[in-house]
Amino acid sequence: MKKYLLGIGLILALIACKQNVSSLDEKNSVSVDLPGEMKVLVSKEKDKDGKYSLMATVDKLELKGTSDKNNGSGVLEGVKADKSKVKLTVSDDLSTTTLEVLKEDGKTLVSKKRTSKDKSSTEEKFNEKGELVEKIMARANGTILEYTGIKSDGSGKAKETLKEYVLEGTLTAEKATLVVKEGTVTLSKHISKSGEVTAELNDTDSTQATKKTGKWDAGTSTLTITVNNKKTKALVFTKQDTITSQKYDSAGTNLEGTAVEIKTLDELKNALR
């Protein structure tokens, strides 16, 4: 009888271990906050394999996984009704989450979103072949850079949403170019794939006395505008994804006053006049 009861107890214990992932609740787990306003439940005890059980709910889909750590890091997976697969990867230090949706084959990407603790994120969408067609990068300061209609050669459309206005342009395999036009003047802001910003100014004005030119200084991220060999304005493209404008004196030798942040598209166009 004792052997029988011992056997039953062992079976029940094994079942309990196997059910760790499917039976997590507030009593036997700890809730951990993750980037992207997600939460993961982590079992208080290890399972039979010496791992901690993980559970999270994303868009009403329950994801499950295991981890060697009890801090919430690890990989969780689930399957949608259409048989597509969802995979959530939580970094070891909990600073980033990567949410992937894949086709039934488990290899072809449908979408992918990486979210950081500072609330910045990169979201990608793919076509039927698993080729990238859209990429949205939300920065920690709330500004957004979007690439849409991406073709196989890397070309497409680009849009940057700053605090109060939007810049639009084109995308190539090497960079995004955002353009603002005012009269005969065209301001182009280039953003490389690594995030480096440069700017240039072109003027189709045929009169040399009023024709504007621009010189870029990579060290200070400044575009200096010159008219008739005199410096007139300095546009600074800051690391905070803003643009400031400051005027030169009448001689074109020294900057006057203080730099003013450009807050609207009209203000940016005025700076090009």
UniProtKB/Swiss-Prot annotation:
Lipid attachment residues per UniProt (S-diacylglycerol cysteine): C17
Highest taxon of source: Bacteria
Key words, A-Z: Cell outer membrane, Lipoprotein, Membrane, Palmitate, Plasmid, Signal
Membrane topology summary: Lipid-anchor
Entries under SUPFAM superfamilies matching the protein: Outer surface protein
InterPro entries, sorted: OM_lipoprot_Borrelia, OM_lipoprot_dom_sf
Provenance organism: Borreliella burgdorferi (Lyme disease spirochete)
A Pfam family assignment: Lipoprotein_1
Aminoacyl-tRNA synthetase found in the keyword field: no
Lipid-binding residues (covalent, N-palmitoyl cysteine): C17
Region forming the signal peptide: 1-16
Name of the molecule in the record: Outer surface protein A
